[in-house]
């Protein structure tokens, strides 16, 4: 069981809550920010997905393997490279860990073993999944609901839902909306949100029905979504290239009221603020960019400040 020593970068006041460090997955390691210190772990590795849990931290390393960090800071490889698949996203759920991959597969990590979910490979509508460039589809993001339901976002294949812990899967949304991220809202049972190429998609009935909101957006192409209290935030750009990217916010319950976040932010970003790069904790909202910047808001996205810069390209971030 290898243990990787924390390498300190700098000690200074960061403004991050001491109890919930900010963890940033970059192309060159996992960067930690506490209230007074910064350090890097897994140096030299690309960290492409992060998932905190009660028993530690789960990450995808170099897109190929799953690593676990226990509460003592020890790292262990729990799923090495698997069948030449790229591992895209990870979701701890009730003692197991769900992983989404390239070629649109899912598998569980259970007791150190790997169990592929065959029912997902035969899900209704799978033969219609595609990518805009003609390649094989991916599982891009996942979420868990309060009643035990699971949601898996296929790019491009919509959002599939399981209500029996992964034994069966059903499509829930128009797959042509091109979903990039799906999330649930912890204190809103039944609410599911998705960042799509057509704007923000919302369901209030666990995915049975959906509505789109794109009012006031400069463009509908959205890559990331998060909820901070009663506020929903999305990242939007002019398209896959990421030109004219921005963050928008609105009340969770008031469709049609998006406002562009501009206080403390550049007018536009030149690259997409991507899936997994926009996260919240209580009143705090944080996002990272592909050129190594982090921006922080302490009032649900109303006012922002640059929190860090000159990091390696950021793939994902989260609070522990």
Predicted regions and their residues:
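Extracellular glycan-interacting surfaces
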Residues: 1-320
